[in-house]
């Protein structure tokens, strides 16, 4: 089997077996601790520009099926696994992981010590990495890797180019696409919502002209400070319409209301993150995928209150506006992959939109 190298910007490197596409690639090396859900993870637009390390030792054993994709075209740069299953065993399987990676042009590496790599990332933080042929000159690879700047226009790359509708006969929801997962759209469709998905740079005036019952801010990749156009839109919407944000949408909501965000050392990526609701003490296990978080101290003096925290590091996991029907969460209530403990948040959004009809808005 052809050999491949994963070179990190700190000079560490790993040599293993090549899987997927043969092309060379550069990205931010991160790790995901989920035991299952690799195909949802690989097709999640929030992973744009990243090389994903799966900590679970065997990946690909149940294959890949197109029904569970979170986007049509995966945006990941590469995949790292301890062992890639050569044969898939599942009645829904349509294609093996290796075949899928080749089809989508995603290079990968297998047979390396993913535990060692994960511990390295935990210690040093996320690092740039390059996947290349094992025969490549290591010094040249390292020099090239260190000279490359990772893109900052990630949301622009994964957002819808134009608005489109997913019809229903219930509440009318505008879903702002910063890299939305298909599962979020499906959760709204389950509740009979008429959903209009709009590009990330849609203005408040354009959204209000659609006369929706509520607005959702989706997940997405990268640094929220790279999407300044979203902040004015959020300020123009909150108080006029019920607002619900997820992941990147949560961070943008915080920035729009005067708070700050920061980059986590190695992020939260997995399906077992415990989150505590401060009002009730309820603890849920959640799916998470983010490299940035809201700075808790920056919320002092704003109109936002913390509703949820992550129990491992006490980072902010939920916010609510003190005056308006607007709330956001850092985690993923739609799951896929991960537990569906917090799926009820979509029902709370529906209740907020019902409150709009009853005149409960403060605008």
From Swiss-Prot:
Keywords: Amino-acid biosynthesis, Arginine biosynthesis, ATP-binding, Glutamine amidotransferase, Ligase, Nucleotide-binding, Pyrimidine biosynthesis. The keyword Cell membrane does not apply. Residues 172-359 form the Glutamine amidotransferase type-1 domain. SUPFAM superfamilies: Carbamoyl phosphate synthetase, small subunit N-terminal domain, Class I glutamine amidotransferase-like. Coiled coil: none annotated. Pathway: Amino-acid biosynthesis; L-arginine biosynthesis; carbamoyl phosphate from bicarbonate: step 1/1; Pyrimidine metabolism; UMP biosynthesis via de novo pathway; (S)-dihydroorotate from bicarbonate: step 1/3. The active site is at 247 (nucleophile), 332, 334. Its EC number is 6.3.5.5. One of its GO terms (molecular function) is glutaminase activity. PANTHER family: CARBAMOYL-PHOSPHATE SYNTHASE SMALL CHAIN, MULTIFUNCTIONAL TRYPTOPHAN BIOSYNTHESIS PROTEIN-RELATED. This is Carbamoyl phosphate synthase small chain. The lineage of its organism: Bacteria, Bacillati, Bacillota, Bacilli, Bacillales.
